[in-house]
């Protein structure tokens, strides 16, 4: 029979205070720092929102991570905290012990509240204070700095989530006193005009990740250019399923020039992902030329590129240290792959992931990329499915991966000899050919996770994954 541990004195003190809400409110100014976090948790769990309103006005730490106390943000506790902050921000003289600089509404470490009481208890002792002065104890001088509210925002629908709508209105009414800092902003189906309204409220220079889905390039560039060029701390930029919707070549050229000029200001960009790349077909050099920072991750997928577009990839230093390159479903069967081979040779020392899935590469083109591929000693993931390869070409490809000892996940297409007139796998022919390919590969190295054949498998429905070791469906 297990014996439940008795409550700690700190917990008992907090519970005692919360039994009398009026007493707990009056005691805030003199409440020891060590009691603040457990008392706040208790008040939160008991829905003592009036206590929360008062506690935030005397918060003795620089950060308050609210969302880590709950799975999702709820309106009532948010209103209680913002009401307390409103009363405080409008005062010229603020409480002596109030040190709050950041209200964090992101999904951060849920162990924060369990871990920190002890740390704060330690910091209350003079010996600890003499050894290290934390940011919480550093005096603030001069004018009051704006309160920073951190949040990750995903705009999916109209009307907006009630918490987000309330927060936007609250911040807008306190411009200059509050900065709404958004480390990640994702826009799915929300019209661009609503995204613009959000960007007028968000502190633009705080956005580290931006994703825009399901819009059209002309509209996006016209409406968002003035905001994009100010996102100077942007690290990740994703455009997914942004459509073309213009047949005017002159207008298209102007739009591309205007858009690519944005990248001259993005000095911290590390990831660029553009799904439906056709809009930049023939213009990719303009974009790559404007990149100011060496990228780690480049994804240009789904569409058509010209040979001149491929050539530019190996000509600029911004792509010289790529760790991840994804060109999946960019149709490459009509152009020379020598520029791609040159790029692979250039980034061989850094490349970890290479995705050439569905590019319809023909076996006659393969020799152009094999020397570069064989040099990619850091490669861990290689997707090459849905390309047109003969059994001999696949054997040659596998031989060129013999020195890639770090490969842990790899996919290859079924050889064309196993395909029928409808380009479907004839399993009676395919099964021995796959065994032959595996035998060839094992002469050089032992694969870890490998998938040879159509994806997903029409027989068992499996697709390449980290869990799949060897695809042996018959």
Curated annotation (Swiss-Prot):
GO molecular function: ubiquitin-like ligase-substrate adaptor activity
Protein name as catalogued: PRAME family member 2
LRR repeats mapped onto the chain: 97-124, 179-203, 204-230, 231-265, 266-291, 292-323, 324-342, 348-375, 376-400
Annotated GO CC locations: Cul2-RING ubiquitin ligase complex; cytoplasm
Family affiliation: Belongs to the PRAME family.
Keywords associated with the record: Leucine-rich repeat, Repeat
Annotated S-S bridges: none
Any GO BP: negative regulation of apoptotic process
């Amino acid at each position: 029979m297990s014996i439940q541990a008795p409550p700690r004195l700190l917990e008992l003190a907090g519970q005692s205070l919360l039994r009398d809400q009026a007493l707990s409110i009056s005691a805030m100014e003199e409440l020891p720092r060590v009691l603040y976090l457990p008392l706040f948790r208790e008040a939160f769990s008991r829905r003592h929102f009036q206590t929360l309103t008062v506690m935030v006005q005397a918060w003795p730490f620089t950060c308050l991570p609210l969302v880590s106390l709950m799975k999702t943000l709820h309106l009532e506790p948010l209103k209680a905290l913002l009401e307390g902050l409103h009363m405080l921000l409008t005062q010229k003289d603020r409480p002596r012990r109030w040190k709050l600089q950041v209200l964090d509404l992101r999904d951060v470490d849920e162990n924060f509240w369990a871990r920190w009481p002890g740390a704060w208890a330690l910091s209350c002792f003079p010996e600890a204070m003499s050894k290290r002065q934390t940011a919480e104890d550093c005096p603030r001088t001069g004018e009051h700095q704006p309160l920073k509210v951190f949040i990750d925002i995903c705009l999916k629908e109209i009307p907006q989530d009630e918490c987000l709508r309330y927060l936007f209105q609250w911040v807008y009414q306190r411009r200059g006193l509050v900065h709404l800092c958004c480390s990640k902003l994702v826009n799915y189906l929300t019209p661009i005009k609503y995204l613009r309204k959000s960007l007028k409220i968000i502190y633009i220079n705080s956005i580290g990740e931006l994703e825009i889905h399901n819009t059209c390039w002309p509209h996006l560039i016209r409406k968002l250019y003035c905001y994009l060029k100010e996102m100077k701390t942007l690290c990740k930029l994703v455009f997914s399923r942004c459509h073309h919707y213009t047949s005017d070549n002159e207008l298209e050229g102007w739009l591309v020039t205007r858009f690519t000029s944005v990248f001259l200001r993005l000095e911290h960009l590390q990831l660029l992902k553009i799904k439906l790349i056709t809009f930049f077909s023939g213009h990719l050099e303009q974009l790559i030329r404007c990149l100011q920072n060496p990228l780690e991750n480049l994804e240009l997928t789904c569409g058509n590129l010209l040979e001149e577009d491929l050539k530019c990839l190996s000509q600029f230093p911004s792509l010289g240290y790529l760790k991840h390159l994804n060109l999946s479903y960019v149709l490459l069967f009509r152009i020379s792959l020598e520029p791609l081979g040159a790029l692979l040779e250039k980034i061989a020392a850094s490349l970890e992931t290479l995705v050439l899935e569905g590019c319809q590469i023909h076996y006659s083109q393969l020799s152009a990329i094999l020397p570069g591929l064989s040099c990619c000693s850091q490669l861990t993931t290689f997707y090459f499915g849905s390309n047109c390869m003969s059994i001999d070409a696949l054997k040659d490809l596998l031989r060129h991966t013999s020195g890639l000892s770090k490969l842990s996940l790899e996919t290859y297409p079924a050889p064309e000899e196993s395909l029928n007139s409808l380009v479907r796998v004839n399993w009676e022919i395919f099964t021995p050919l796959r065994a032959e390919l595996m035998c060839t590969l094992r002469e050089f190295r032992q694969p870890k996770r490998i998938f040879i054949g159509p994806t997903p498998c029409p027989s068992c429905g499996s697709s390449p994954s980290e869990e799949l070791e060897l695809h042996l469906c018959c």
